[in-house]
Amino acid sequence: MTYHAIGRFIGNFSYLEYQLRFFLIDKIKLDSKFHNALITHDFSLLCTAVQEVHRQTTEPEVYDRLKKLISRVREFNDLRVKVVHGTWFPYQEGGTLLHVSRHSLQDHYTEEMAEYLEQQAELMFDINLEMMTIFLRGRDYPDEEEPAVTGTT
């Protein structure tokens, strides 16, 4: 169960990151020959760029909601760092994670991480759908309706 939870969480995070990059590229109409240059930016900078572009191009209430979602997405990234760089004890107490803070060098054990990661993966998926709805709302769709945002985990 632990390995499944880790994979699901990281997979959902990867898709979320891809979506953020795609919609930023689309919003600023970046020429395709420059797409790879955007891929090299770190996740936090990507979040800042998405937020700043939308601050200047969307209605205040939409921007405020997106800002809250981006804040939550940054929390997912903090968790991702722990998941990826921590030490796992997959068969102990529902998946135990040992993380050592780079800032304080203090270690912290967290038990029952498999269930928690499953919950966070589900929440991340829902937040990604909501952000996609915001991003798609601002696109131009000539002579047709905007596409519906649907999906499953």
State where each predicted segment sits.
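Generic N-terminal initiation segments characterized by hydrophobic and/or small/turn-forming residues
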Residues: 63, 94-95, 114, 126, ...
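Amphipathic alpha-helical interface elements
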Residues: 1-52, 71-85, 89-91, 120-149
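Acidic interhelical loop/turn segments
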Residues: 88-108
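Short, glycine/alanine-rich amphipathic alpha-helical segment
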Residues: 41-68, 102-119
